Amino acid sequence: MRSLGVIFLADVVGYSKMMAEDENRALNLIREFQKEIIRPTLDKFNGNMIKSLGDGWLIEFKSASESVDCALEWLKLVKKQGKLELRVGIHLGDVEHEEGPPPDVYGGTVNIAARLESIAENGEVAISNSTYLCLDENQARLFNNCGNQTLKNIATPVEVWSTGRLNLGSKGMKREDEGPLISIKPFAATSELASIFCKDVTDNLEKYLNQKDWIDSTVQKNP
């Protein structure tokens, strides 16, 4: 099922190093963060936890404004505690929902949010223009316009706003020396049944290719 949603992706900076240095401490910090910060703030800002990624979290909101408030509160609280450092990416767009169990979300909106998270500087939030346009004046003034950015595996440039600078050397940025690229372009279907079948094939192929590191892909949703 496809519907409009706000995808929020966050991860812990330097988590692999933390695990290598003291695994028990790293795991305890994550558990503490989930109990003391994530659960209360998701209740407060109406966020729906889709899944925990070990060192990160995939969350869906119905409101762009609430998603940004949640991100800013996370960063404020972890900075105050001084134990973890986060980066967050947020994008508003069409989201493909998989009922499960377990439930999941995927599609271009999830991919863009993931790229935004990866290019955010440590301790910052990067959001798309579609997210920014939904913010109130007080929220909007916290973000700097970083211009159109060409993101890895994303067919068209994305206008990005950030609370700080962007990490333009990130793996989330598209580079000229990248490996093989496959482009998925659908044909116009001749019937409603064929259209549904083609959409399912396209979505499943996109989901599969995005899990592979050795090949890049771009997906054109409409013929």
Feature map (PLM): residue ranges:
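Short beta-strand
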Residues: 48-52, 144, 218
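Short beta-strand->alpha-helix linker/helix-N-cap micro-motif
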Residues: 178-223
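Intrinsically disordered or compositionally simple regulatory linkers and C-terminal tails
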Residues: 1, 163-182
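Catalytic beta-strand-to-alpha-helix segment of the class III nucleotidyl cyclase homology domain
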Residues: 58-165
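A short, flexible beta-alpha/helix-coil linker loop
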Residues: 15, 94-97, 187-192
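Catalytic NTP-binding/metal-coordinating core of nucleotidyl cyclase/transferase enzymes
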Residues: 1-72
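Generic solvent-exposed, charged/amphipathic alpha-helical segments
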Residues: 35, 39, 75, 132, ...
